[in-house]
Design a protein with these regions (language model features):
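N-terminal beta-strand motif that seeds the catalytic metal site of vicinal oxygen chelate
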Residues: 1-27, 83-86, 135-138
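Core segments of cupin and vicinal oxygen chelate
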Residues: 10, 17-62, 102, 115
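Vicinal oxygen chelate
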Residues: 2-9, 12-21, 39-42, 50-57, 63, 75-101, ...
Length: 138
């Protein structure tokens, strides 16, 4: 029987894909406000969509976010109730929230300790309403 490719230590989590209504607005949010880099972007005219990859490091070493923009999407996406959030580590959650709030970013859960733990966290929303948890890590 062949070796399970997921248990060889060579499998790796590559990216999470989210659909975005306004690619320019999302690119600005993830690059300018959250400090990620645009890693690559490609239009697919025959499928009428664009894929853009953003992250804090190269895809060969880091997990990144794939932003999918369907050109004919006029309405906001229904985010459903299955997806919760993804998390980013920052050295100072309160300062990060202050900076993001000054840019008009919605902060549904301000910086503070977790209810059932000691970590300082906050939740912000991206332009499409996806929740992003900020976790304080020094």
């Amino acid at each position: 029987m062949a070796e399970n490719p997921f248990s060889t230590g060579k499998a790796r989590y590559l990216h999470t894909m989210i659909r975005v209504k306004d690619l320019d607005k999302s690119m600005d949010f993830y690059t300018r406000l959250l400090g990620m880099k645009e890693l690559r972007k490609k239009d697919f005219p025959s499928g009428e969509f664009t894929l853009a990859f953003v992250g804090y490091g190269e895809e060969t070493a880091q997990t990144v976010i794939e932003l999918t923009h369907n050109w004919d999407q006029d309405e906001p996406y229904d985010l459903g109730n299955g997806f919760g959030h993804f998390a980013l580590a920052v050295p100072d959650v309160a300062t990060a929230c202050d900076i993001l709030a000054s840019e008009g970013v919605e902060i549904p859960r301000p910086a503070g300790p977790m209810k059932h733990g000691g970590s300082v966290i906050a939740f912000i929303k991206d332009p499409d309403g996806y929740l992003i948890e900020l976790v304080e890590r020094n």
